[in-house]
From Swiss-Prot:
Residues bearing the modification Phosphoserine: 193
Region (Disordered): 71-90, 109-139, 154-179, 193-218
Gene that produces this protein: PKAR
GO CC annotations, alphabetized: cAMP-dependent protein kinase complex; cytosol; nucleus
Lineage: Eukaryota, Fungi, Dikarya, Ascomycota, Saccharomycotina
UniProt-annotated binding residues for 3',5'-cyclic AMP 1: 232-347
Ligand binding (3',5'-cyclic AMP 2): 350-466
UniProt xrefs under PANTHER family: CAMP-DEPENDENT PROTEIN KINASE REGULATORY CHAIN, CAMP-DEPENDENT PROTEIN KINASE TYPE I REGULATORY SUBUNIT-RELATED
Name of this chain's protein: cAMP-dependent protein kinase regulatory subunit
InterPro entries on file: cAMP-dep_PK_reg_su-like, cAMP_dep_PK_reg_su, cAMP_dep_PK_reg_su_I/II_a/b, cNMP-bd_CS, cNMP-bd_dom, cNMP-bd_dom_sf, RmlC-like_jellyroll
Length: 466
């Protein structure tokens, strides 16, 4: 998102244009409108993410809240019964604590018995609670700060000591029959599921990778070839690809050293600069690769186990890229691209019928191409595979025997005739100045421009011929 300075500059320009009499009211109206636009955009992104199975803003459903309340009542009642029967709390099954990091006690120390006295049990199971009144909300358990929070943060805690008395709003826990003790640092630093980190794209404007280092022209040339072969980097724009290359970290690996091990969690993607590596699956050699090759791609997408063991068969020089850096670069580039193309697309008349959600999907599918003055973008008679929007620049449209028939500029589009009618290109389009175009492939054209196709057909210059 735009930085605060950009927002102030936009506001300043608006003030200079409108010259409002009531400045404060104008400012209030302006920023209220900007906030509404931003919130609308964020919610549309949430809908788009949900359609792809990604949850941007996790929440607790009503069903989960009811289940949690029931579990809490049952838990409190069983503790109270145990207390009244004279059974010590140590005889009750221990609870596994996998709670939010915002509660008073850490989740990774050990299994801890939750000692609730009969007073707290009775309070928890009171009729008011049972009837659903004042039930724990979404933040009551996760962000609960009780009297225990007065303890010093850096105070030493015996991991085997019993847990202090919980507050009345403690988060309900799952009971485990005959639990096995966990190591003290169990899962404290690593994820065990196939997942990705949560990132905020609006915080990436001024971010620079920790291992960022400008590479020499020779290194850039070699790494571009290696990166270009990999499907993960094919759709990156030139700036993002350059950032990836300059974020690669050089690693020297001696002969015989194990680089990655089958079954381990993957954190890095590797490019072989020099040397040879061998791949083993279940201790069986399956492949060998040398300079220019790469491996470990899935580590950039998911925190997934390694599919093979890789060993350096000679002394090797590798370039490594960690998953978090790649995801930041990819997300930051995609977010900026979506913002940029949303502004472009909503100003193109034929796309007025698209919703913000549809424009966002269209923006994700667009690729960028550059043409210098005199270069041909499409040629008459060729097979049509792409639809084009001009982001900036100028181009001439010409036909054989007729010469230049029209000129195109920013916001204009071309290439739709061949896609609509499955015909060869009906004209040649040549850049007359440096021109940047956004292109949409044939499959994306048919899939994403459904509401617009009818408008394009009405504006088809060859329509009278069919």
């Amino acid at each position: 998102m735009a930085t605060y300075q950009t927002e102030l500059d936009l506001f300043k320009n608006e003030v200079e244009q409108k010259q409002p009499n009531d400045f404060l009211q104008f400012a209030a109206n302006y920023f209220t409108k900007r906030l509404e636009q931003q919130r609308t955009f964020v919610r549309n992104q949430e809908s788009l993410a949900l359609s792809k199975g990604i949850v941007l803003f996790p929440s607790t459903s009503k069903h989960d809240s009811v289940a949690a309340s029931s579990a809490s009542l049952s838990h409190g009642s069983s503790k109270a019964n145990a207390s009244q029967s004279g059974i010590s709390s140590s005889g009750v099954d221990e609870d596994v604590l996998f709670k939010s990091p915002f509660v008073d006690r850490g989740p990774h120390s050990t299994h801890i018995v939750d000692h609730l006295d009969s007073t707290h049990s009775n309070t928890t199971a009171s009729p008011a609670k049972a009837s659903g009144g004042d039930a724990p909300g979404i933040f009551k358990g996760n962000f609960n700060v009780g009297t225990e929070s007065q303890r010093k943060v850096n105070s030493s805690v015996d991991p085997m000591a019993p847990e202090p008395t919980a507050t009345t709003h403690s988060f309900p826990r799952r009971s485990v029959v005959n639990p096995k003790p966990l190591p003290i640092n169990f899962n404290a630093q690593r994820r065990t599921s196939v997942s990705g980190e949560t990132l905020q794209p609006d915080h990436l404007d001024d971010w620079k990778p920790e291992n960022f280092q400008e590479k020499s022209p020779e290194q850039v040339s070699r790494l571009e070839k290696a990166v270009g072969k990999n499907f993960l980097f094919n759709k990156l724009d030139s700036d993002s690809k350059k950032l990836v290359i300059n974020s690669l970290e050089e690693k020297s690996i001696p002969q015989g050293k194990e680089i990655i091990k089958q079954g381990d969690e993957g954190d890095y993607f590797y490019i072989v600069e020099d040397g040879t590596v061998e791949f083993y699956v279940n201790n069986q050699k399956v492949n060998t690769s040398g300079p220019g090759s790469s491996f470990g791609e899935l580590a950039l997408m998911y925190n997934s186990p390694r599919a093979a063991t890789v060993i350096a068969s000679t002394d090797c020089i590798l370039w490594a890229l960690d998953r978090l850096t790649f995801r930041r670069i990819l997300l930051g580039g995609s977010f900026k691209k979506r913002i940029l193309y949303d502004d472009l697309l909503k100003n193109i008349p034929i796309l007025k019928s698209l919703s913000t959600y549809d424009r966002a999907k269209l923006a994700d599918a667009l690729d960028t191409e550059y043409y210098e003055a005199g270069q041909t973008i499409i040629k008459e008679g060729d097979t049509g595979e792409n639809f084009y929007f001009i982001e900036y620049g100028e181009a001439d449209v010409s036909q054989e025997g007729k010469g230049v028939i029209t000129k195109l500029g920013k916001g204009d589009y071309f290439g739709e005739v061949a896609l609509l009618n499955d015909l060869p290109r009906q004209a040649t389009v040549t850049a007359t100045a440096r021109t940047k175009v956004a292109t949409l492939g044939k499959s994306g054209f048919q899939r994403l421009l459904g509401p617009v196709v009818d408008v394009l057909k009405l504006n088809d210059p060859t329509r009278s011929k069919h």
